[in-house]
Amino acid sequence: MAIGALVVCLSGPRLWAGQAKPLAVLEGKLLSTRGDCPLLQIGGREQTLSANTPYLYQTLQDKRLDGREVRLEGLPQPDGSFQVHWLYTVHNGKLFKVRYYCPVCNIVALGPGNCVCCQQPTELQELPADKPQS
């Protein structure tokens, strides 16, 4: 019994089954106050944003981040939007992770809103991306 093999040669980077697409990077100013759709201002143009999780989309809509310089890592979508997978704020060229924290209950949350325990609003925190978080 003969076993055949199909060989396909592709130019460019090779991706194996199960390997994620390389993420694209966009940097600009986050505009989160214009309706429901967050935008990234890059130079003179505006890029519509989506996200791969609901909490990340809610973070992009957080008015406390409006006007902040950000670095977004994600994938361009067929509809022209940019699907964000990772969000960082940028201060003096350094990257910061965004998280939400309740100082009353000592609880960390992924997205904005009230604490799941005491129902008080969570605080926005920006933590250096190059340091381990506790």
Regions found by a protein language model. Name each.
Residues V25-L30, G67-P76:
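OB-fold and OB-like beta-barrel modules that bind single-stranded nucleic acids
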Residues C118-A129:
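Short Cys/His-rich micro-motifs in 6-15 aa windows
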Residues P103-V104, C115-C117:
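Short, cysteine/histidine-rich loop/knuckle motifs that typically chelate Zn2+
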Residues L75-K97:
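OB-fold/S1-family single-stranded nucleic acid-binding modules
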Residues Y55-L72:
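Short nucleic-acid-contacting surface segments enriched for D/E, G, S/T with interspersed K/R
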Residues Q19-D36:
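Structural detector for short beta-strands of small beta-barrel domains
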Residues M1-I3:
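N-terminal export leaders
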Residues G35-N52:
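OB-fold (S1/OB) nucleic-acid-binding surfaces
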